């Protein structure tokens, strides 16, 4: 199936970049076998939730101390530590370097990898290992991938790559939004909104 510009406009009514997104998706979706109404609906729904309607292409870590304690208590076990990070002038960088240190292929907190490889793209690609794998698939460097992820094409292609790499079409074919969400999010955060996007997308795509 072909996702038309009018359909995308209905799916993302507040997005001013429909032409850009449509140009990217019309090429990429068929390339990654996201080519049936259920697959396209599931893909667009998940991306719309993850990116605030295809508007946010970089992870926002602008958290207050209370949120750091609530969301990342493992890394901020005390109020004092959370406050220390929340009040830093470069707090998003500092927070990323702490919460993503020594995992997903990243170095320790001092390496700066956490922020360098923080979430980017429509389905936020996170961690040095994922950046390297995505870059390798395109035969570019992780640094080039980081820049590419800031473009419409790169943000969309990284999401398609993640979708294919994690075999998400099998869950899209079943309409299993719960499992899809767990594969993307690690949990079920925002499930209600994702389902709402999905049902709307199915309607728009005439399925």
Predicted regions and their residues:
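Low-complexity, Gly/Ser/Thr/Pro-rich intrinsically disordered linker/tail segments
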Residues: 170, 183-207
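Extended serine/threonine-enriched, polar tracts that run as long, contiguous segments within proteins
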Residues: 160-169
